[in-house]
C-alpha cells in the first residue's frame, strides 16, 4: 500500500553537511536504499534557504523500512545519517478536497 509521508531532516551544523547528505541521497547507493522504501520518482524535495534542513514529500511503499531509514537505523544509511543528520520528523499526509 502506498502512503504519502513528509520527512523533515535537520542537518548537523558544519561545513558541507548539506552537500554531503544530498550527494549520498542521489548516489547509486542512496538511490538503491530509497527504492526499497519509496517510489523515488514521486519524491518532492524542498531545501531551507540556509540549507539547515531538507524536506521530502515521499510516496512510501514500505512504512516500517521508512521509519527505520528516517531514524538513522538503516545499516546502509546509518554512516551518512550519523555524520550529517541531527533529527528527522515524520508526518502522515492526506489529501484535502477543494
Segments and roles (model prediction):
Residues 1-78, 86-98:
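Short S/T/G/P-rich N-terminal loop/turn motif that feeds into the first structured element of a domain
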Amino acid at each position: 500500500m502506498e502512503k504519502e509521508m513528509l520527512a523533515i531532516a535537520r542537518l548537523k551544523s558544519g561545513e558541507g553537511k548539506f552537500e554531503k547528505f544530498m550527494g549520498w541521497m542521489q548516489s547509486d547507493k542512496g538511490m538503491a536504499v530509497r527504492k526499497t522504501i519509496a517510489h523515488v520518482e514521486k519524491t518532492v524535495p524542498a531545501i531551507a534557504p540556509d540549507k539547515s534542513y531538507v524536506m521530502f514529500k515521499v510516496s512510501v511503499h514500505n512504512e516500517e523500512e521508512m521509519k527505520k531509514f528516517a531514524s538513522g537505523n538503516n545499516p546502509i544509511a546509518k554512516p551518512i545519517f550519523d555524520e550529517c543528520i541531527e533529527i528527522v520528523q515524520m508526518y502522515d499526509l492526506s489529501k484535502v478536497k477543494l
